[in-house]
């Protein structure tokens, strides 16, 4: 059976805490779970049936792969790199919030490669007819 001409993107299904910030975090696993799109990998478990499948492994509470790269704290505490969860809970211990260097490192290591992979797939695979951003 041929694969469907679809690219599936799952930006909010990850659960990992970036190791670079693990000692700064104060939210609980429950907070982290509530801030993401739980079970999206299971709901959209069609990896073997589509031409391309891209999923984030970092939890949305830390790097939101579905935001504009310039949507950042303090203007938006629930932006691309967060200072608060979507429910308004501080993510980092007081005095251990992200600085500009750490923010840029997280974007370079997690955000840009995710979007680069999507762009590469779309640019190099003319068979992909539809991209679905799944939540």
Range-by-range predicted roles:
Residues 1-131:
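N-terminal catalytic or cofactor-binding beta/alpha core of small enzyme domains
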Residues 133-135:
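Acidic/histidine-rich, metal-coordinating catalytic segments
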């Amino acid at each position: 059976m041929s694969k469907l001409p679809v690219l599936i993107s799952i930006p909010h299904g990850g659960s990992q805490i970036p190791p670079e910030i693990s000692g700064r975090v104060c939210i609980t696993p429950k907070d982290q779970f509530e801030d993401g799109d739980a079970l999206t990998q299971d709901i959209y478990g069609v990896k073997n049936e589509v031409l391309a499948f891209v999923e984030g492994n970092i939890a949305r509470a830390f790097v939101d792969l579905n935001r504009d790269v310039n949507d950042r704290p303090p203007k938006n505490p629930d932006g691309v790199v967060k200072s608060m969860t979507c429910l308004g809970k501080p993510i980092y211990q007081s005095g251990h919030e992200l600085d500009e260097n750490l923010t840029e490192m997280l974007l370079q290591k997690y955000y840009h490669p995710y979007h680069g992979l999507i762009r590469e797939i779309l640019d190099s695979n003319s068979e992909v007819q539809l991209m679905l951003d799944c939540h």
